[in-house]
Amino acid sequence: MQLMKSSYLELTARGHVTDLLKPDDTLEMLETYGFAVTQSPVEAVSTAHAYREIAAIREDFGLGEPYVPLLYRDRDEPTVTAVTRKGGSDHPVFHTGEAQGWHTDGLLEDIGTIKTTLLYCVSPAHRGGRTFLLNAGRVFEELRMEDPEAADVLLRDTILGRRSTIPGVDREAVGPVFLELGDGHYATRYGEGRVERWYPADAAEQHALDRALRFFRARRDDPDVRIDLLLRAGQCLIFRNDVLAHGRENFTDDPQRPRLLLRSLHTNAPKKPS
């Protein structure tokens, strides 16, 4: 990957949508920017067609079968999740139109477990529903240069707990916010939303943590390290969940055609099959 040197500002002129039938172009985008958006060649996309295209993407990039997160293992959840409004659901975000703060997928998983997320848009919202991506590792590297003490707190393996907000599910996973990888990049589980619980060891560490989080809040709206994507019908967002953080703005549905995205999670990183 080249994420530590990449700027999302480069995509203003270049664009970020690739042809579903040109996987080499898509893989180059993923290697450079950590994400890609494929465009279906089909004009009117059905849910059945979306599932077929997701299967083709999995095969093209060696992703393997979808991974079911630990949080949902006992809930009889499908391997590919329908992210849409649904009455009676106990999930605080999936089946509502509410915004979702910065996070990585895999609430209870060890850092870096879920490497790839696919989000396929069958039908967009009437208004809103953008997905945000943050080059979290690059921001962290900047923090290490500016305030090493604050950065070191985010590497501590008991600093961040992520706790389920699903009613009746009292589970939490504790770990670091960042983990150094061998290729000069960082795995991340950065987030600031409803599920995070912070565990600084003492007052000095609390001050360092506060500085680190302020740094991220100041940087995460910069289009150099953040990109906002509004998926259209037939587009599939592929991104490196282990190195990028993501979020979602709230949305309003067309009652006749509500927003529907299909989400597929994978423990493999995209690669060119041998």
From Swiss-Prot:
Gene3D superfamilies registered for this protein in UniProt: Clavaminate synthase-like
First-tier enzyme category under EC: oxidoreductase
Single GO term (MF): dioxygenase activity
EC number: 1.14.11.49
Residues that, per the record, bind Fe cation: H103, D105, H246
GO annotation (BP), single: antibiotic biosynthetic process
Pfam families in the record: TauD
Keyword Amino-acid biosynthesis applies: no
Tagged with keyword Oxidoreductase: yes
Pathways involved: Antibiotic biosynthesis
Record keywords, A-Z: Antibiotic biosynthesis, Dioxygenase, Iron, Metal-binding, Oxidoreductase
Activity regulation, per record: Inhibited by several divalent cations, including Zn(2+).
Cofactor (UniProt): Fe(2+)
Reaction(s) catalysed by this chain's protein: UMP + 2-oxoglutarate + O2 = uridine-5'-aldehyde + succinate + phosphate + CO2
PANTHER family for the chain: GAMMA-BUTYROBETAINE HYDROXYLASE-RELATED, TAUD_TFDA-LIKE DOMAIN-CONTAINING PROTEIN
The protein, known as: Uridine-5'-phosphate dioxygenase
Species: Streptomyces sp
Native organism taxonomy: Bacteria, Bacillati, Actinomycetota, Actinomycetes, Kitasatosporales
Gene: lipL
